[in-house]
UniProtKB/Swiss-Prot annotation:
Protein name per its UniProtKB record: Cytochrome P450 26A1
Localization per record: Endoplasmic reticulum membrane; Microsome membrane
Cofactor or coenzyme needed: heme
InterPro entries named in the record: Cyt_P450, Cyt_P450_CS, Cyt_P450_E_grp-IV, Cyt_P450_sf
Biological-process GO terms, alphabetical: central nervous system development; kidney development; negative regulation of retinoic acid receptor signaling pathway; response to retinoic acid; response to vitamin A; retinoic acid catabolic process; retinoic acid metabolic process; vitamin metabolic process
Membrane topology annotation: Peripheral membrane protein
GO cellular component: endoplasmic reticulum membrane
EC number: 1.14.13.-
Family, per entry: Belongs to the cytochrome P450 family.
Organism: Homo sapiens (Human)
Tissue specificity annotation: Expressed in most fetal and adult tissues with highest levels in adult liver, heart, pituitary gland, adrenal gland, placenta and regions of the brain. Expressed at high levels in lung, pancreas, skin and uterus (at protein level). Lower expression level is detected in spleen, kidney, intestine and adipose tissue (at protein level).
Induction annotation: By retinoic acid.
Biological function: A cytochrome P450 monooxygenase involved in the metabolism of retinoates (RAs), the active metabolites of vitamin A, and critical signaling molecules in animals. RAs exist as at least four different isomers: all-trans-RA (atRA), 9-cis-RA, 13-cis-RA, and 9,13-dicis-RA, where atRA is considered to be the biologically active isomer, although 9-cis-RA and 13-cis-RA also have activity.
């Protein structure tokens, strides 16, 4: 074969497909950008739209932190991209986030990716809008009143104490912290939010099966909206269906108990409140909506708190001087003495633990469990000199906003004392947003704060521990967790500081 023939063959085999691929990317970019509002003179934010149809979803899923850091360095606090099948503008920074969070119903509305809406369902709180969202949120908020939280304290303390005893019994072999914390938080969420014992959800292995199903659903929650066998959406829906089947048993048992007046007059869990709200309005119970709400409550009630609690163990293990200060605060309140270790915690005591509150805040600043929130533009509007076209998705980034917040110095340092200092209310309001903000802020944030405080108190006054692999590499999918599941060895703390 002559040289011209070889060159022609190489052209057909390598060069031509490459040129076609580059042309396809350019045409895709032009197609996406054509969705701009031509009646608005402002430019679109800078950025790229990735590959045809897939956009930049795969890059973000596979290299999340590296990908997002590269984007921030290249484009700044606002840029366009294409994620989960939609043209998207990603924003960060207190001023930009303020516009988004305070613009609910006026500029933007909540709009999670299609995969999230499909898996969680239209009947869950995060996917409701307007009056339906307002009414549902009002009902669920009653489960997180101060009176209700006071009732939850002994339940949380009991579950945490039981888990710590098991961790301590592992001895030298140690354990994987993250899976254990997830099981703990799942049991707490089952008891408090759904009002049922985990082991009563079905057969003897139901707790572990439900936890594993939630893990599978969570892994595939943010997927391309393609429902074919073995796709992420397909696997997520399959896990969701298993969860619904298990939860339906609990819901039917709950309904029978309420009709028989077995619930008593004590604190009401969120599921009971939703059922009674339907009865009070004379509505027929919608089993599908109850299953969707229960799944959402369990997901939010254990997935995010497990992430935060694991990060607490990580940072307190890496910074012993902070753990020392936690114990000094406990000692000052009489909570570290042997004679007082059996005293019951209550809301009044927990609210006095200011430094522990700062440790939790600093943990949530560095490792917010949820990295951001999703909105859709209701109309074209201006943000930082760029147009946000009507119909485009808007993602506000919690983790990036914390990273760039000007009110924090030495941002990469774990320093709970920074929260002991007063910050201007207006400046800090949107610089620290682990629970989101505005009308769509996390409905269970006070529950999460109390749970994490109790967890920290019990951990600090009963345990010492060693992280066997040192500082872990963190990954987000969709909540933050350690890639190695955080192997650690726990030993008894003997009360001496």
């Amino acid at each position: 074969m002559g040289l011209p023939a070889l060159l022609a063959s190489a052209l057909c085999t390598f060069v031509l497909p490459l040129l076609l691929f580059l042309a396809a990317i350019k045409l895709w970019d032009l197609y996406c950008v054509s969705g701009r509002d031509r009646s608005c003179a402002l430019p679109l934010p800078p950025g790229t739209m990735g590959f045809p149809f897939f956009g930049e979803t795969l890059q973000m899923v596979l290299q999340r932190r590296k990908f997002l850091q590269m984007k921030r360095r290249k484009y700044g606090f606002i840029y366009k991209t294409h994620l989960f099948g939609r043209p998207t503008v990603r924003v960060m920074g207190a001023d930009n986030v303020r516009r988004i969070l305070l613009g609910e119903h006026r500029l933007v509305s909540v709009h999670w990716p299609a995969s999230v809406r499909t898996i969680l369902g239209s009947g869950c709180l995060s996917n409701l809008h307007d009056s339906s969202h307002k009414q549902r949120k009002k009902v669920i908020m009653r489960a997180f009143s101060r009176e209700a939280l006071e009732c939850y304290v002994p339940v949380i303390t009991e579950e945490v104490g039981s888990s710590l005893e098991q961790w301590l019994s592992c001895g030298e072999r140690g354990l994987l912290v993250y899976p254990e914390v997830k099981r703990l938080m799942f049991r707490i969420a089952m008891r408090i939010l759904l009002g049922c014992e985990p082991q009563l959800a079905g057969d003897g292995d139901s707790e572990q099966q439900l936890v594993e199903a939630f893990e599978e659903m969570t892994r595939n929650l943010f997927s391309l909206p393609i429902d074919v066998p073995f796709s992420g959406l397909y696997r997520g829906m399959k896990a969701r269906n298993l969860i619904h089947a298990r939860i339906e048993q609990n819901i039917r048992a709950k309904i029978c108990g309420l009709r028989a007046s077995e619930a008593g007059q004590g604190c009401k869990d969120a599921l009971q409140l939703l059922i009674e709200h339907s009865w009070e309005r004379g509505e027929r119970l919608d089993m599908q909506a109850l299953k969707q709400s229960s799944t959402e409550l369990l997901f939010g009630g254990h997935e995010t708190t497990a992430s935060a609690a694991t990060s607490l163990i990580t940072y307190l293990g890496l910074y012993p001087h902070v753990l020392q200060k936690v114990r000094e605060e406990l000692k000052s309140k009489g909570l570290l003495c042997k004679s007082n270790q059996d005293n019951k915690l209550d809301m009044e005591i927990l609210e006095q633990l200011k430094y522990i509150g700062c440790v939790i805040k600093e943990t949530l600043r560095l490792n917010p469990p949820v990295p951001g929130g999703f909105r859709v533009a209701l109309k074209t509007f201006e943000l930082n000199g760029y147009q946000i076209p009507k119909g485009w998705n808007v993602i506000y980034s919690i983790c990036d906003t914390h990273d760039v917040a000007e009110i924090f110095t030495n941002k990469e340092e774990f320093n709970p004392d920074r929260f002991m200092l007063p910050h201007p209310e207006d400046a800090s309001r949107f610089s620290f947003i682990p629970f989101g903000g505005g009308l769509r802020s996390c409905v269970g944030k006070e529950f999460a704060k109390i749970l994490l405080k109790i967890f920290t108190v019990e951990l600090a006054r009963h345990c010492d521990w060693q992280l066997l692999n040192g500082p872990p590499t963190m990954k987000t999918s969709p909540t933050v967790y350690p890639v190695d599941n955080l192997p650690a060895r726990f030993t008894h703390f003997h009360g001496e500081i």
